[in-house]
From Swiss-Prot:
Keywords: Chromatin regulator, Nucleus, Repeat, Repressor, Transcription, Transcription regulation, WD repeat. WD repeats lie at residues 88-131, 139-182, 185-225, 231-270, 301-338, 356-396, 405-438. Disulfide bonds: none annotated. Residues 1-67 are annotated as: Disordered. GO terms for cellular component: ESC/E(Z) complex. Polycomb group (PcG) protein. Component of the prc2/eed-ezh2 complex, which methylates 'Lys-9' and 'Lys-27' of histone H3, leading to transcriptional repression of the affected target gene. GO terms for biological process: heterochromatin formation; negative regulation of transcription by RNA polymerase II. The keyword Transcription applies. Component of the prc2/eed-ezh2 complex. Interacts with yy1. Can interact with ezh2, hdac1 and taf9. This is Polycomb protein eed-A. It is found in: Nucleus. Residues 40-57 have a biased composition (Polar residues). Pfam families: WD40.
Amino acid sequence: MSEASGRAAGNEMPAKKQKLSSDENSNPELSGDENDDSVSIESGTNTERPDTPTNAANAPGRKAWGKGKWKSKKCKYSFKCVNSLKEDHNQPLFGVQFNWHSKEGDPLVFATVGSNRVTLYECHPQGDIRLLQSYVDADADENFYTCAWTYDSNTSHPLLAVAGSRGIIRIINPITMQCIKHYVGHGNAINELKFHPRDPNLLLSVSKDHALRLWNIQTDTLVAIFGGVEGHRDEVLSADYDLLGEKIMSCGMDHSLKLWRINSLRMKTAIKESYEYNPSKTNRPFVSQKIHFPDFSTRDIHRNYVDCVRWLGDLILSKSCENAIVCWKPGKMEDDIDKIKPSESNVTILGRFDYSQCDIWYMRFSMDFWQKMLALGNQVGKLYVWDLEAEDPHKAKCTTLTYPKCASAVRQTSFSRDSSILVAVCDDATIWRWDRLR
């Protein structure tokens, strides 16, 4: 992994400059609440991620949604587009993540991934986006799909994990500006990376090889592999830890969502042993757990690829290529999620967030740090922001953010930790910064 050369500058994080073309209109006057229909350009399907299978609106044999639609009313949040950039590789940007491990007063830093490039930026208060560092993989055919932030538990340095089409996880230290570790094990592309909410060393990866893997990046051990007998039957596209880090929900191309508990005695022991493992004191390799059976599984929520899943308390938010994010829970409404049995066949759909023109796959939504806002972009550059604080979920309010020049598929969004900035990345290599007005 080499760096793009250039001028070093720096706060805490050294800066490396590369050529970036900036959008000529970097301070547009358009507020996100206006001109709902100003975007009308269709974007072509990106060749790097294949087409979604035909999604019939009324597939036979499927029941109608359990509850009514979550109607969108005027949202209390308002955003303004203040800046945009275009990365010079002109390839789709698949991932963006703000570093939420920074302290109050620290620079607001986010990372983007696309092509064989990983780029770090800093958001300045006046709307500027400053390029900090850029890393280029030695293999021109690498295509990074996902990134995730953590920190070194010994030095407190920020660390960034990235992965993509080659199935190699790379850990970058932006302070020393080096790729300090890499992990090989998945048999195919990696679609998402997630760090444990309470343990900065536990990294979850999900792959095209139908499996999930849990790594300990402090001791460089593979703790567990989730998949096999009752695992996913096709690419795993997304996964998320719950807030306490006791459960994982995964989803994929097999239309299924699967729950994996990592607070079982078996998994707690495996994690503990991964910390105690020292290769210099033993000739034996670390024995990874093979978890073949999920603790719950369903195919009753979606009828197409499930490409994004997130926990919201004990509820699940998931989406397919069906123009809706569905809110649901395993079992019946009154059931305790921690007592759900693997044989449970019931699911309770609580409602859905509807939007339009988003029927290609690998389009991921995000929430802010406090889980008060939900954001998703569609394939023609529109952004939808929902207010999750509404007491009645059926009254979740939505703001639609549009800007005429943003007309390409929005692959992912990310909020700054204080929720003041929303960044979106697109298939045409553009980055869009929206600042919150209220």
